[in-house]
């Protein structure tokens, strides 16, 4: 391989990651580490407020406020009227308002058009664009890769560094390509595909990698499904997930408030069409999934890798040879209150949560509403629907989705993160069981001793009206 500037240059076909990464390199720090320019810095109330306060304490200005955007989502109440935001949430929101105003940062505030979960509003406003490098102090920033962006979460010190310099130092990750090929079976969604992948490779299967998703199932998938796929990349340990932009991407982005307009749009699309892995590009790891073999998925344990088809049975630790894995399964079963070998379908549930940066977009609510239409939430079940943004809420109301949910006995709430991370006291009570469209089922994630099963919006709605984990394929019209 040739050497340029003291660095070995790979002249083989380039991956999508390499093309976007190389466009953002300001300086090489070492053989595998670079100083990168950041195109978009997204802030939320939890990390953004603290980062801005930290910057002010150092007497430093925000370097590029016009490339920084903020919204409250984590610590705000999603109750009607925003009633009951806890003291910490009120303080974080007040700080976010004060510091963004002082710094000239655009804030999409509560009840304003554009407010919502940061990983929902980025794409819908056109802040997230193909080829962009996007960071946020949140692990699910990988969501934006569904539009062909290089997007990843950063820590608190990195957040302050980006505010001060509009740059970040990063080690280039290894590359993995996951090819989803085949026709999507009835009742199977993007959420099922990514959960099945996590179950296949494990929660650490993507550690150290940037994962590019490809294949016929991805090419035929709408953008909101692609965002769901990329959202859970971090749950298989990956730094980022990304999908090559195509005509579906361009049609989605066109006309959004922050998207290029006029001649700039044509120039942008011309550039974006080059953002795909070359046919001879080499990946460090390849995984192929036949989507025709996938059925609706549901998690049973305390990690996203603890997943099985809805017609499956809870694993029996006695069948596991590896002592460490057997012990982990025993702990998970004890926490979840499940019997080894029992069918997962029919497991009684107490709560259903439809929301989060994974599954709170309009298409998600439509899928859940289709199941809820004409049915009632089962006795003893509390079911919440939390739209991902003010825009999603507005559009859902315009379609009458809110009425479908309310008539069925669901609680229709305001945009925010809510029960995904037990924010603002919005928790599943101890010992109770939830089916959730969110991304993590860790111990205590939805509240102390809360038991969480991850599923698609349609599967969650099926659980709400059945009072138990149910196969949505028997209910969809």
Swiss-Prot record:
Explain how, and how many, cofactor molecules are bound: Binds 1 [4Fe-4S] cluster per subunit.
Key word Nucleus present in the record?
no
Q: Which residues bind [4Fe-4S] cluster?
A: 357, 417, 420
Keyword annotations for this protein, in alphabetical order, are: 4Fe-4S, Amino-acid biosynthesis, Branched-chain amino acid biosynthesis, Iron, Iron-sulfur, Leucine biosynthesis, Lyase, Metal-binding
Name the pathway.
Answer: Amino-acid biosynthesis; L-leucine biosynthesis; L-leucine from 3-methyl-2-oxobutanoate: step 2/4
Q: Name one GO biological process term.
A: L-leucine biosynthetic process
- GO molecular function annotation: 3-isopropylmalate dehydratase activity; 4 iron, 4 sulfur cluster binding; metal ion binding
One Pfam family name is: Aconitase
PROSITE patterns given for it? ACONITASE_1 (PS00450), ACONITASE_2 (PS01244)
InterPro entries given in the database record: 3-IsopropMal_deHydase_lsu (IPR004430), Acnase/IPM_dHydase_lsu_aba_1/3 (IPR015931), Acoase/IPM_deHydtase_lsu_aba (IPR001030), Aconitase_4Fe-4S_BS (IPR018136), Aconitase_4Fe-4S_dom (IPR036008), IPM_dehydratase_rel_enz (IPR050067), IPMI_cat (IPR033941)
Name the family the entry cites.
Belongs to the aconitase/IPM isomerase family. LeuC type 1 subfamily.
Q: What does this protein do?
A: Catalyzes the isomerization between 2-isopropylmalate and 3-isopropylmalate, via the formation of 2-isopropylmaleate.
Q: What is this protein called?
A: 3-isopropylmalate dehydratase large subunit 1
Species assigned in the record: Bradyrhizobium diazoefficiens (strain JCM 10833 / BCRC 13528 / IAM 13628 / NBRC 14792 / USDA 110)
């Amino acid at each position: 391989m040739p050497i340029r500037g003291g660095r070995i240059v790979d002249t083989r076909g380039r991956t999508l990651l390499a093309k976007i990464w190389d466009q953002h390199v300001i300086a090489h720090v070492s053989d595998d580490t670079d100083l990168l320019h950041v195109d978009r810095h997204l802030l939320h109330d939890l990390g953004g407020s603290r980062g801005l306060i930290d910057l002010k304490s150092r007497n430093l200005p925000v370097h590029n406020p016009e490339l920084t955007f903020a919204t409250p989502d984590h610590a705000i109440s999603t109750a009607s009227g925003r009633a009951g935001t806890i003291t910490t949430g009120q303080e974080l929101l007040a700080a976010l308002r004060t510091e963004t105003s002082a710094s000239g940062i655009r804030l999409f505030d509560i009840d304003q058009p554009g407010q919502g979960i940061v990983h929902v509003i980025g794409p819908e406003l056109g802040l997230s664009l193909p080829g962009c490098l996007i960071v946020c102090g949140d692990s699910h920033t990988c969501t934006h890769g569904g539009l062909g962006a290089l997007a990843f979460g950063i820590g608190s010190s990195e957040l302050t560094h980006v505010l001060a310099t509009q740059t970040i130092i990063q080690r280039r990750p290894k590359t993995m390509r996951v090819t989803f090929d085949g026709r999507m079976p009835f009742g199977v969604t993007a959420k099922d595909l990514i959960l099945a992948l996590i179950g296949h490779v494990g929660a650490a299967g993507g550690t150290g990698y940037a994962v590019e998703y490809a294949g016929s199932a991805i090419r035929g998938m709408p953008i909101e499904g692609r965002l769901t796929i990329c959202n859970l990349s971090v749950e298989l340990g990956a730094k980022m997930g990304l999908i090559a932009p195509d005509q579906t991407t361009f049609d989605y982005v066109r006309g959004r408030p922050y998207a290029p307009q006029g001649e700039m749009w044509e120039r942008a699309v011309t550039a974006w069409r080059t953002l795909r892995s070359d046919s001879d590009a080499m990946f460090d790891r390849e995984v192929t999934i036949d989507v025709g073999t996938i059925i609706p998925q549901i998690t049973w344990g305390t990690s996203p890798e603890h997943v099985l088809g809805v017609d499956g049975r809870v694993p029996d630790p006695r069948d596991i040879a590896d002592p460490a894995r057997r012990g982990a399964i025993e702990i998970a079963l004890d926490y979840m209150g499940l019997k080894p070998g029992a069918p997962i379908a029919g497991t009684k549930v107490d709560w259903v949560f439809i929301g989060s940066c994974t599954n709170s977009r309009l298409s998600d609510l439509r899928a859940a509403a289709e199941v809820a239409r004409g049915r009632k939430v089962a006795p003893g079940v509390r079911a919440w629907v939390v739209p991902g943004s003010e825009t999603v809420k507005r559009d859902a109301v315009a379609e009458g989705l809110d009425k479908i949910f309310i008539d069925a006995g669901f609680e229709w709430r305001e945009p925010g993160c809510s029960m995904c991370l037990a924010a603002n006291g919005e928790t599943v009570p101890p010992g109770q069981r939830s089916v959730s469209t969110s991304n993590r089922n860790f111990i205590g994630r939805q509240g102390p001793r809360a038991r969480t099963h991850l599923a698609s919006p349609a599967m969650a709605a099926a659980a709400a009206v059945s009072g138990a984990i149910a196969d949505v394929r028997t209910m969809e019209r």
